[in-house]
Every structure is written in structure tokens, then in C-alpha cells.
Amino acid sequence: METQGVMKEIQYEEFEEKIIEIRRTSKVTKGGKNLSFRVVAIVGNKNGKVGLGIGKAREVPEAIRKAISAAKRNIIEVPVINGTIPHEIIGRQDASKVLLRPAAPGTGIIAGGTVRAVVELAGIQNILTKSLGSTNPLNLALATMNGLKNLLDPRKVAKLRDISVEEVFKGVRREDNA
């Protein structure tokens, strides 16, 4: 069992980490205010894997450690084709919406701070994004992750439709003679 734990740690070493937000929160009690911190962190290998985590603790370093640990447990696979996403999609989380559009090579990452961090760590180099609604960093990050998670892999779509990957991108339809 120990070797599995070691393998998982080695697997995580390749991930880059970014802190999206550190928020101080307070709980008002009869004895006064209890301060704590909430940290939102993103981890990714810049090669199609990205994760988001939230950590809460009385001290900032402990909250950061918890957030990064949670992000490593919540990693998703993102289909990246030629440095961009395969199709347009809208990610939603509460009052936040994020429009993600594929872009031509050389466009770069057109995105705000929170969305940019998620997209960069996913390994996407060319993308157009637009944040709509609430700009709360946590909800924007969750909406972006939702959009990336719901992207369809062209290879899987081609297999389901029994056509080639090129035909998926061209939008060619086969006429059935049945």
C-alpha cells in the first residue's frame, strides 16, 4: 500500500499551482469575532489536466495547503486539440457564466484573471473567453471548470457517430439509404 502513496506523490509533482483568491472570513459569536481564511487554488500540468480546490483554516498557510490538496483530488481531463478547445461551450456556476470559444493559432489566451489561470494550467494556448454575470473569483473558476469538464472529445464523438475525426470537425453528414 505504501508504494501506491509514493506513486501518487510522484504523479502530483509535475503539477503547477496557482492561488486564485485568499479571503478573510469572520464568524461573529458571543465572545467576539472568529477569523478564518478561505483559499481557492488551481493545479494543472499544462497538458490537459487541471483541478480546483478550496481550503479553509485559521491560518493562511494551512488553508493554502488544504486548497492545493483538494485541487489535486479534483483533477479533470480537458481535450486540448492544437492548443485550443474542440468546440464552443458555456460553463455555469450560480450567477456566473463563462463563454469559452476555440481560437486560431497565434491568438493567445483572451481571458480575465481567474479564467486565465484555469485555462493556462489546463494547457490551452489559444482561446477566447467572456465572463458573464457575477465576477466572484470562486464562481468564475467553478464555471470555467464546469465548461472544460463538459467539453466533448472529438475522438469519442467520432467513435459514437462511426465517422472519422476529420468529418467531426468538418460537420459532414452521412446520408443513410435505409
From Swiss-Prot:
Domain statement: The N-terminal domain interacts with the head of the 30S subunit; the C-terminal domain interacts with the body and contacts protein S4. The interaction surface between S4 and S5 is involved in control of translational fidelity.
A single BP term in Gene Ontology: translation
Keyword match Protein biosynthesis: no
One annotated Gene Ontology cellular component of this protein: small ribosomal subunit
SUPFAM superfamilies: dsRNA-binding domain-like, Ribosomal protein S5 domain 2-like
Species in which this protein is naturally found: Thermotoga petrophila (strain ATCC BAA-488 / DSM 13995 / JCM 10881 / RKU-1)
Role according to the record: With S4 and S12 plays an important role in translational accuracy. Located at the back of the 30S subunit body where it stabilizes the conformation of the head with respect to the body.
Subunit field text: Part of the 30S ribosomal subunit. Contacts proteins S4 and S8.
Keywords assigned by UniProt, alphabetized: Ribonucleoprotein, Ribosomal protein, RNA-binding, rRNA-binding
Similarity annotation: Belongs to the universal ribosomal protein uS5 family.
HAMAP family to which the protein is assigned, alphabetical: Ribosomal_uS5_B (MF_01307_B)
GO molecular function: rRNA binding; structural constituent of ribosome
Gene3D superfamilies registered for this protein in UniProt: 3.30.160.20, 3.30.230.10
Start and end residues of each S5 DRBM domain: 15-78
Domain of life: Bacteria
Gene: rpsE
Protein name, per record: Small ribosomal subunit protein uS5
InterPro entries, A to Z: Ribosomal_Su5_D2-typ_SF, Ribosomal_uS5, Ribosomal_uS5_bac-type, Ribosomal_uS5_C, Ribosomal_uS5_N, Ribosomal_uS5_N_CS, Ribsml_uS5_D2-typ_fold_subgr
Keyword RNA-binding part of the UniProt annotation: yes
Stored Pfam families: Ribosomal_S5, Ribosomal_S5_C
